[in-house]
């Protein structure tokens, strides 16, 4: 079951158009209902933080935004009914990417795709004899 409206843009996690047309806040899981969904957050500056007030910690994550210009946010909110999840799994994940996620490699490489047209890279050029090195860091601290 999908949480967010398909193909809609938003500028804050607190105001995302839902699949049913209502505005939802995806910044504070868990949510009512059972959902599995992905959101592409475009043009991220290479820094994200996640605050867990229940367990009193803050997770900081940074990476090279020249390599990964977006973040794929995946939301698992009891939407996986099969074993071993059995509708009990609740989590949010963040994965730095450079792609037009879910729209194929062909579209990600095409400079006419809607994400690239907004100056957000959707691919990384790799070379056989030149390894790509990319730095990242993460830390956890008390709130």
What are these regions (language model features)?
Residues 1-67:
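Active-site/ligand-binding surface loops and adjacent short beta/alpha elements
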Residues 59-143:
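Active-site pocket scaffolds in enzymes
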């Amino acid at each position: 079951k999908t949480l967010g409206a398909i193909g809609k843009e938003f500028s804050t996690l607190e105001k995302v158009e839902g699949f049913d047309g209502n505005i939802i806040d995806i910044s504070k899981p868990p949510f009512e209902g059972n959902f599995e969904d992905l959101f592409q957050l475009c043009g991220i500056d290479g820094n994200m933080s996640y605050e867990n007030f229940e367990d009193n910690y803050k997770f900081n994550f940074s990476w090279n935004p020249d390599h990964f210009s977006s973040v794929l946010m995946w939301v698992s909110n009891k939407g996986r009914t099969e074993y071993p999840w059995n509708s009990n799994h609740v989590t949010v994940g963040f994965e730095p990417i450079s792609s037009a996620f879910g729209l194929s490699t062909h579209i990600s490489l095409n400079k006419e795709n809607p994400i690239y047209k907004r100056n957000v890279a959707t691919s990384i050029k790799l070379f056989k004899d030149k390894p790509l090195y990319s730095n990242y860091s993460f830390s956890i601290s008390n709130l």
